[in-house]
Amino acid sequence: MKKILIALFLATNLSGCAVAYKVYDAFFMAHYDNIEYALTNKVRTLSELAIEDCKDQSKSKDNFEGLYFISVELKNFTQYIPDNPDAHKLAGNLVELTKQGREMYVKSPSVSEGFCKIKLQQINRSAEMAQKVIGSKPR
């Protein structure tokens, strides 16, 4: 028994603090949350499907309004969950991207189809990255 304890002690001390930090992070990070994942999935799905509507200014404006609303909801939801700064930061990034698209439709009566598609692709990639981070949390 003493040999096992000594081996564990040496293994954790010889490999540096990295092991201790990984154990600490795994133990104290926020756990998987269905609501976080669902809201992120909504942003990703809507941004993917909304690309088809980029020719229609009215539909695109409504889509960006919806994306902005869901992103703000996600950001607010993640804000006070303990040990959850990564998800909150990713949600903040989604808010900024959706806000940029929303503001463009508010300011300009005609927004190019290219802008719409590129912005929705950015939102989709960002939501996918957030989904990977949120989905990989311990259960």
Annotate each PLM feature.
Residues M1-I4:
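Positively charged n-region of N-terminal signal peptides that target proteins for export
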Residues A11-L14:
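Bacterial Sec-type N-terminal signal peptides, specifically the leucine/valine-rich hydrophobic h-region
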Residues A18-K22:
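Bacterial signal peptide processing site
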Residues D25-A50:
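Post-signal peptide N-terminal segment of mature Sec-exported envelope proteins
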Residues D33, L97-R139:
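C-terminal amphipathic alpha-helix
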Residues Y37-T40, R44, F64-S71, A91-T98, ...:
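Generic structural concept
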Residues L46-A87:
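Alpha-helical segments in soluble extracytoplasmic regions
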Residues I70-C116:
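Long, amphipathic, charge-rich alpha-helical segments that form helical bundles/coiled-coils
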